[in-house]
Amino acid sequence: MPTEANTYDPQRIESIAQHYWDSTHAFEVNEHSNKPKYYCLSMLPYPSGALHMGHVRNYTIGDVISRYKRMTGHNVLQPMGWDAFGLPAENAAIKNKVAPAQWTYKNIERMRTQLKSLGYAINWSREFATCQPDYYVHEQHMFTRLMRKGLAYRRNALVNWDPVDQTVLANEQVIDGRGWRSGAPVEKREIPQWFLRITDYAQELLDGLNTLDDWPEPVKTMQRNWIGRSEGLEIRFEVRDVDNNALEALRVFTTRPDTLFGVTFVSIAPEHPLALHAAKSNPGLAGLLTQMKQGGLSEAELKTQEKRGMDTGLKAIHPITNEQLPVWVANFVLMAYGTGAVMAVPGHDQRDQEFANKYGLPIRQVIALKEPKNQDESTWEPDVWRDWYADKTREFELINSAEFDGLDYQGAFEVLVERFERQGRGQRRVNYRLRDWGVSRQRYWGCPIPVIYCPTCGAVPVPENQLPVILPENVAFSGTGSPIKTDSEWRKTTCPECGGPAERETDTFDTFMESSWYYARYTSPNAREMLDKRANYWLPVDQYIGGIEHAILHLMYFRFYHKLMRDARLVDSDEPAINLLTQGMVIAETFYRKNPDGSKDWINPADVNVECDERGRITGATLISDGQPVLIGATEKMSKSKNNGVDPQIMVTKYGADTVRLFSMFAAPPEQSLEWNEAGVEGMARFLRRLWTQVHHHASHGPATALDITALDTAQKAIRCKTHNTIARVEDDYGRRRSFNTAIAAVMELSNTLARFDDTTTQSHAVRQEALETMVLLLNPITPHTSHALWQTLGHPETLLEDLPFPKVDTTALVRETATLAVQVNGKLRGTIEVATDAPREHIENNALTEPNTARFLEGLTVLKIIIVPGKIVNIVAR
């Protein structure tokens, strides 16, 4: 039904449009279409209970692209689901004394309502939550396949252990080395965990990046660095104990064998077998290893912690010089990386140098410039020359390296590799920084790992006909241990191979497992198998949208899991997504007051009055409730910790969904940070009210007659030219550039131009009708509710605008018959003239000289020359 109100009423308009979309199942799609497919997907949300502005921006970008693509003739899929397992639900369960499942499903209901209020063109019939058994059963089935193929395996690995809560902690739950809830010092504990062999796909993941032409370079660079391919030499160092007995040889991988003569000690990880062996007879070392178990495992902590170590008393024999090198335990060497041992070259490596300086170990130079440019370059200082260890491009040669003196990096590399391989003491290797994916989590709220442990048969995959292994949802959750560990009825079972008593695995999957394949399940949401033939119709995703913070975890696992599904013959494609758009953050001002202890109480911007200078910069702020000053902080990402978030629902209620959508697209290009500014939101609301009034005022003059482009005068042609120029700009902005802010600006320009067009003739009414229809359709991807209503106001029946073709450029309208030229006198603007585009020079000069305001400024002056810039400027030089 058309809206008759002349006042812009967002709630009424949006209710009518959304009811129409729901009742007509407007955004349901299938695979039986002769249109080209287009799969647009924004990363699925975690059901925290409330949308934030980051969600709104992400999903609005996806919705704009989806609606635009449907208007350009595509069969568009835009689904939605919920990444529903995970730690926040457990934390909320502890805080609110409610089962994680109950908390999660309640939040999904609320967030679904919020998403629908924003009018997104989502195919809701494909919705699912990853915590539902009919979703994760397929994940369990895939895991059992991977076990049988040897791509899933179990081994011991270090975790953060809270000795009070008796639970494993994620890195983010370790605060300054202590458990976030108990406050107890966290220990590093080695426990059995399941892994997927992502390293088997390391080279393919690396090579595949070269095919992703439409992924941002920063994402591809981060993935290349995370995969970390390096070519080098694995060297065997013989090891002797304090009694000169031979122990198992130490394997060390290095990309710089040319620095071998600079090795003055060997560092090993605290968990290395040699460290544990030495500690048996060294109480001091045993005590240090116990201390090194304290603290978290995050890379950030390991990088910033104080470097600590101890001499084990063991000696590594230099493979060329036979020098006995001390073997030190060092807390910065990780057992999970490489071989857990490092040949230390403190003369040319910062970390080794800092360690050597602390413990008085030798530092030796083995690299020198061939042709030093100055005294500084020829004088060796370790804190300068350490940088050479990583610099292979400078012109240098080996020194203090026996018969290898004078060789450059490449020459030394090849000679040493050949020598070690010939002697059987080493071999060329390709190494990757990438580690196998640890998928075990010692948590309750996750997908159960489908494995049974039998004393006789060992680890046995759950048979397919016994899947899914269903996670009990109606549990009491305290945070101390996992409910399924203490649920003997759930845990105890029988071995599927021998029939004897057995127990289920009580670990659950890393939640990245669910988010690594959800995009594919949307294509076959009701399939009995993991996927069916519909997957190959929709995949790969044409446009994927999400934050760059997911570059090296989700997006890596996303690509890896797609290759697993390909190798299982579930999908045909090699990569999961063709285009990737990484949207910027939503940021906002922060305000606070300082407490006597120096801590800060963060105040929400909605509770603050601000004063601004003429440039709009905040110069002062007071708390609304007491009128007293508050301090102005930095502009930062919206977050709970800084209390600078804005509730989208409040904004939708206050301004309407289309205003919120319009601002989120107008305030910044998609890839850049968007600074929240309510004054800007109010500006968008004013524009929509003005457009509403503009259309209704036009419609009040009755229906337009047919446009006769052969009967238009100059002014009418100018409006048509502006209209079709706007179509061209917006089409490029939506389609190629993904520059939605400039698309909006172009429509605003057209609206302003039309507002100044006051001709009331029949053909002018028709020209205005075309311009207004164009604006309504161009804005439809961004402001669909308003466009839905205004299309009817312009005399059309209620319809789905996405099924109408996107406006087409009439190239004949772009041919301008006249041009507006600025007229300057001695470089200063004095007037404008309108002339035919093919007007002769004499005609242009005469019009410029006789333009009234220009003529006034020329009185008493002699014209020396006239410079004409075709189509732009006439500059009169006079004295």
UniProtKB/Swiss-Prot annotation:
Pfam families: Anticodon_1, tRNA-synt_1, tRNA-synt_1_2, tRNA-synt_1g. Its EC number is 6.1.1.4. Signal peptide: none annotated. It comes from the Bacteria. Disulfide bonds: none annotated. Gene3D superfamilies: 2.20.28.290, 3.10.20.590, HUPs, Isoleucyl-tRNA Synthetase, Domain 1, Valyl/Leucyl/Isoleucyl-tRNA synthetase, editing domain. One of its GO terms (biological process) is leucyl-tRNA aminoacylation. PROSITE patterns: AA_TRNA_LIGASE_I. A motif ('HIGH' region) lies at residues 45-55. SUPFAM superfamilies: Anticodon-binding domain of a subclass of class I aminoacyl-tRNA synthetases, Nucleotidylyl transferase, ValRS/IleRS/LeuRS editing domain. GO terms for molecular function: aminoacyl-tRNA deacylase activity; ATP binding; leucine-tRNA ligase activity. It catalyses: tRNA(Leu) + L-leucine + ATP = L-leucyl-tRNA(Leu) + AMP + diphosphate. ATP binds at K640. HAMAP family: Leu_tRNA_synth_B. NCBIfam families: leuS_bact. Belongs to the class-I aminoacyl-tRNA synthetase family. This is Leucine--tRNA ligase. The gene is leuS.
